A protein has these predicted regions:
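Beta-sheet entry/capping signal
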Residues: 1, 40, 47, 56, ...
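Extended Gly/Ser/Thr-rich low-complexity repeat segments
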Residues: 5-23, 49-65, 71-73, 725-742
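Catalytic and substrate-binding clefts that recognize carbohydrates or anionic sugar/phosphate headgroups
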Residues: 5-7, 34-235, 245-246, 251-252, ...
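Solvent-exposed beta-strand/loop surfaces of large extracellular or lumenal domains
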Residues: 13-32, 335-340, 623-642, 743-758
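Aromatic- and carboxylate-enriched substrate-binding clefts and catalytic-loop regions
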Residues: 16-20, 267-543, 578-579
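A low-complexity, Ser/Thr/Gly/Pro-enriched, surface-exposed linker/loop concept
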Residues: 1-39, 77-80
């Protein structure tokens, strides 16, 4: 990892501490040499050359092959000055009598905000840009989550600004095995033309970026996690099925939904309460209290859900209505932005203010967490502003002017929960679903979804590259609203009762089975499985089939979560990450790897009876449904009846499955597991287990069982178990099956190595 910084100042320059980067610089052995105007710095992996004449920096392999180079004279720092007139008032503070600015604009009628004296703030900054030269045919990924449908991010201009459905991350990764993170949090334009590739940000003190070289896609993501923070373990139950809609209008309805799932015997782990649980009046917006009369007995609701082993997530926004207690408390601290949010009676809080973050958590803790809330749905964390003037973004946050830090705002809303929930207890893992994110959001236990998208096969297809590009930015937990947020329009007028929409929903449901989070949600039309018909009707049966498949995969999903945490791995992987030398994978946007084993090819065309699937050339592939072994490096045509999503398993994969049906993820211990071997190559897998929903694993309370397959000798080795934890299964049965054959053996495992020959 190389940090490159450029300023107009000379001498020792104290650059600001990064808000996204947590990795501290370390001593690295570097050989430095100079020849004329060229300065070369070489490490054991990388060579960096600085042209003192043009300011160009070039990155190369040790063999001299170029990875990336800046453009000659490709840097710009244009001085800018912002002037702001703000109001002041005396407020409660840690320092007696301290004056804290409310920062409402002159003459602005801001409900709930006091008026006071005026003063002027002048900020000197720069518009900063840096241009690079990429190879003409070089393919790059990343830039957060976009809704363009593009996998390759070349040949376009993108304004990176946090918005609903668009997550702004100024980072791209190349198929050449490197990544580049532009460390600037203001609105930034990415521009790629035949003349060059550039980042241009509207405010910054300096050019500041990080070059990461891992040699391949997986290794570069791992470096990005080292740079910006590792993703902690998620609770096991979060990998089960989630049900939601916009919105459950009473606590009785919430409990009724859970009861119906249990009565039907369809697995369910999480239910999500969307907005208005605080009441219907906009002045009570996001009070973070159950003030709605239809939620007057929240303790009863949590008690009922607890008896059914159903967890709850709740919607919390960063804006607060002017009639709420929390609004008034934040207002006293001068911690509300002056701009109008949604609704107009609400204002967004300054998440960069640690005291304000503490206030928000205090309400979440008192009125939600202590009652039994298990997870947090952080909506509109861009945040949303309406009719804001440019001068409004001169607001001085605790990290500088808001315009300078706008894009990193969602990271701090997640930080508010992570820091404070962990300070409250380590017995329950933080789990956050946030609509916007930034480099480093993963370190706070946050994942994202793709926002308020509309229902169509075209939009569905675009979610695949949106999620893959987002995951490449180092944030591993991502999902979508199954069936899209908006189901209505000119196409699906009856939504869940419309066979055409049911087809879209079921195809989307299959895709979601192979996402890090499997979650049904949307507006206008109910989404519960029983709303689509009764058991025996295809739209019900296929959903149930895939929910049960999801639960059978829990050992694989949880073990992959450990690889994400321990080794910086990813659930969602573009095919080039699996086969980096297969150029045919580079542009593919409608297939992906799910973990190490599964190649998934969602059905993204209406009424499709088959679809073509490219199998990378790095190995053989096995049809998940039939066991047929196929050579890589070819396109196959796979039949796609409504119950089938094409899934192929990489040869050599070892996939653990549960053997007992459950109603929730932790209902039964894994004392009997199937190990399914997909032959054709050597393989390995690490089965991971821990206490499921606390942080004891950070102190070593977990176990790993290494498993290897020797394809030539046809020997499976289940290695010695490493580690221990409270409640660990000490003795279990493994049913070992060879995919595509009748070969099967059952063994008893007590933690000592076993070798099974076939």
């Amino acid at each position: 990892i190389v940090r490159v910084s450029k300023t107009l100042e000379s001498g020792n320059v104290n650059l600001r501490k990064s808000l996204a980067v947590v990795l501290e610089p370390t001593q690295v052995e570097v050989n430095v040499s100079r020849q004329n105007d060229m300065v070369k710095a070489s490490s054991s992996l990388l060579e960096v050359i600085l042209d003192l004449n043009t300011g160009r920096v070039q990155f190369s392999n040790l063999d001299g092959s170029k990875l990336l180079t800046e453009k000659d004279y490709g840097v710009q720092l244009m001085p800018l000055q912002y002037v702001q007139r703000i109001r002041e008032k005396k407020v409660e503070s840690h320092v007696a009598g301290e004056v804290v600015p409310t920062q409402s604009a002159p003459g602005q009628n801001t409900p709930g905000l006091d008026r006071g004296k005026m003063r002027t703030i002048v900020e000197n900054t720069y518009e900063v840009s840096q241009s690079f030269i990429l190879d003409e045919d070089e393919v790059i990924y990343g830039l957060g989550q976009q809704q363009t449908g593009k996998m390759n991010q070349r040949n376009q201009r993108l304004v990176l600004e946090q918005n609903n459905m668009q997550i702004a991350v100024p980072y791209f990764a190349s198929v050449k095995g490197y990544g580049l993170y532009w460390d600037n949090y203001s609105i930034t334009t990415f521009d790629d033309t035949p003349m060059g590739t550039s980042f241009r940000s509207e405010a910054g003190e300096a050019i500041d970026y990080y070059f990461l070289y891992g040699g391949n896609g997986d290794a570069t993501v791992a470096l990005l996690r080292q740079l910006s923070g590792q993703a902690p373990m998620v609770p096991l139950w979060t990998l089960g099925f989630w049900q939601c809609k916009e919105r459950y209008k009473s606590q009785d309805e919430v409990v009724e939904v859970a009861e119906k799932y249990r009565k039907l015997g369809v697995p369910l782990d999480g239910i999500i309460q969307d907005w208005r649980y605080w009441g219907e009046d906009n002045s009570s917006w996001n009070a973070i209290q159950f003030l709605n009369p239809n939620f007057s007995r929240p303790q009863e609701m949590f008690s009922s859900l607890r008896k059914m082993n159903v967890k709850m997530m709740i919607s919390v926004w960063p804006s607060f209505g002017n009639g709420t207690e929390i609004f008034k408390e934040l207002d006293k601290k001068g911690a509300l932005y002056p701009m109008v949010s949604s609704p107009r009676e609400a204002r967004v809080y300054d998440a960069f203010n640690p005291e304000a973050r503490g206030i928000v958590w205090d309400y979440m803790n008192r009125y939600m967490f202590q009652l039994g809330m298990s997870a947090w749905w952080m909506d509109a964390t861009e945040p949303e502003f309406y009719g804001a003037k440019q001068s409004d973004f001169n607001f001085q946050t605790k990290e500088g002017a808001l315009r300078n830090v706008r894009n990193i705002y969602p990271l701090y809303t997640s930080k508010a929960i992570w820091d404070n929930q962990r300070a409250t207890t380590l017995d329950k893992r933080v789990y956050i679903l946030t609509r916007s994110a930034y480099i480093g959001s993963q370190r706070y236990g946050a994942g994202s979804w793709s926002g308020d998208i509309r229902a169509s096969f075209d939009v569905f297809k675009k979610q695949i590259p949106a999620g893959l590009n987002f995951s490449i930015c180092g944030i591993p937990y991502w999902n979508t609203d199954i069936g899209a947020w908006h189901p209505y329009g000119n196409v699906y007028n009856t939504a869940h009762k419309d066979p055409a929409y049911q087809q879209l929903y079921v195809r989307w449901f299959q895709f979601a089975t192979f996402n890090p989070m499997m979650r049904s949600h949307g507006t206008g039309s109910p989404r519960e499985i029983y709303q689509f018909g009764e058991r025996g009707y295809w739209a019900f049966d296929v959903q149930e089939q895939y929910i049960k498949l999801r639960y059978s995969l829990l050992p694989y999903l949880y073990s992959t979560a450990w690889q994400v945490t321990k080794n910086g791995y990813s659930y969602l992987r573009q095919l080039s990450m699996e086969a980096p030398h297969d150029t045919s994978t580079y542009q593919i946007s409608d297939e992906f790897m799910f973990g190490s084993a599964f190649l998934v090819a969602p059905v993204v065309e209406e009424d499709a009876v088959s679809r073509s699937v490219y199998l990378p050339d790095n190995t053989k592939w096995i049809d998940f449904w039939t066991g047929q072994i196929l050579d890589g490096g070819q396109v196959v045509e796979r039949a796609t009846p409504i119950e089938i999503i094409p899934v192929y398993v990489k040869a050599g994969s070892i996939v653990p499955f549960t053997t007992n049906e459950v109603q929730y993820a932790t209902e039964r211990k894994w004392d009997k597991l199937e190990l399914r071997i997909y032959p054709g190559d050597n393989g390995e897998f690490v089965l991971y287990e821990d206490e499921n929903d606390n942080y004891n694993y950070e102190s070593g309370a977990y176990s790993e069982i290494p498993i290897t397959w020797d394809n030539e000798k046809r020997i499976l080795t289940i290695g010695d178990r490493k580690g221990r934890f409270a409640g660990m299964v000490k003795n279990r049965k493994f049913i070992v099956n060879i995919a595509g054959s009748s070969s099967s053996k059952t063994v008893c495992y007590n933690g000592r190595e076993l070798r099974i020959e076939f």
